[in-house]
Amino acid sequence: MSPDRKLITIFGGTGKQGGSVAHSLLQNPDFRVRVITRNAQSDASRKLAALGADIAQGDGFSGDEMLSAFSGSWGAFVNINSDDKIFTTEGGPTEFDMGKIIVDSAVQAGVKHLVFSSGPPCTEMTNGRVRMKAMDMKNKIEQYARSLGSFETFTPIGAGWFLENFLGKEVAPVFGGFPYFPDDQGYLTFRVPYWGGDEHVPWLSISDDFGDIVQGIFLDPGRWNGHFVHGVSDIRSFEQVVADFAAVTGNKARFQPILPTWEAFDTHGIQELEDVKLMFGFTQLTGGRYFGPEDTEVDTARQLKQITGLKLGRPEGQHKLTSARDWFAARFAN
C-alpha cells in the first residue's frame, strides 16, 4: 500500500453512478475514498463505510459543507441527481446553482483532478426543438468548470443507457413487456422509437463497467484532460440487443419500433417518461448522437476498462467491457 494514498471524494456516491465509482476505487489500495451524502446513516452509506469508504455528511447547496467534504482531496467525481425534487420546485434553485457551489468548493479545497458526470447541450444541438433540462443543466455546469481553468485536469463523462434498467419489472409494460411479460402472440416485445442515425445505441452496465471507466481516468488524468468520455459498455441497435437476449435465454423476443417518430411514444402522463420521450426526440434529431456533436464510440471506454483491470491485477478475462449479450446471460439465462 502506498504511504501517500490519494484521496478521491465522490459527490453522489450513494447513487448508481457514484456507487459504481466508489466500489471500483475501493479495490485500489493506492486510493482513499470519501463519499458525500446528505444521510450518513442510510443503508447505502453504511455499506460503503463497511467497505472502507469515509462518509462525509453534506448538502450540495452548502458551500461550507462542500469545502469541508472536499478538503484534502486529490481528485473528485461529481454526479448530481437531476431528479431531486428540489429542482422541480417552482421558483426554486436549479441544478446549475448546486453545480456551481460544488465546483467552486472543489476549487477552493484544492482538488486537482475533477471527473464530472455531464450531458450534451440538447437545446443547442436541436436548434431549440428539444429541451432536456437535466442535460442542458449538466452541460452548463461542465462549461462553467472548463471556463475556470482551475483544475489540473477536468474530464467530463456521459453515461449511456443503463442495461440495469431492464431489471425493473414495474416499467417493462411501458416498453412492450420486454424482458418479462409476453404479448398476446407469446413474444417478449421491446417497443420504443428508433434511436436515429445508424441506430448505434450506447448501452452501459453501470454496475460492471462505469466505475472502472472512471477509475481509468484517475489512473492517468493528464491523458484524458478535457476529453468528453463516452460511458459505454456496448454499442448495439435495439434489434441487436433483443436478439442477444433471445440467443442466451431461448425466449421468443422481438423489437417493434414505435412509428412514425419519437412523438408517437405514449408517456401515460408520467413525468419520467416525458424525459425518455425527449431523449428519443434528441437522438432522432441529431442522427443518433447522444453524447454531443461527435459520433458515439466505445474505444475510449474499452481502454479505460483495460487500464483499471491491469492495475487491479484482475484475470485477463475481466479487462473487457461487458457486452449486452454477456450482461443478459449473467442475469436472465437459466
Swiss-Prot record:
One of its GO terms (molecular function) is oxidoreductase activity. Induction: Expression is regulated by a complex signaling network which may include cross-pathway interactions mediated by sensing of the cluster final products or shared biosynthetic intermediates. It holds the Pfam family NmrA. InterPro entries: NAD(P)-bd_dom_sf, NmrA-like, NmrA-like_oxidored. It comes from the Eukaryota. Belongs to the NmrA-type oxidoreductase family. This is NmrA-like family domain-containing oxidoreductase lnaB. The lineage of its organism: Eukaryota, Fungi, Dikarya, Ascomycota, Pezizomycotina. The gene is lnaB.
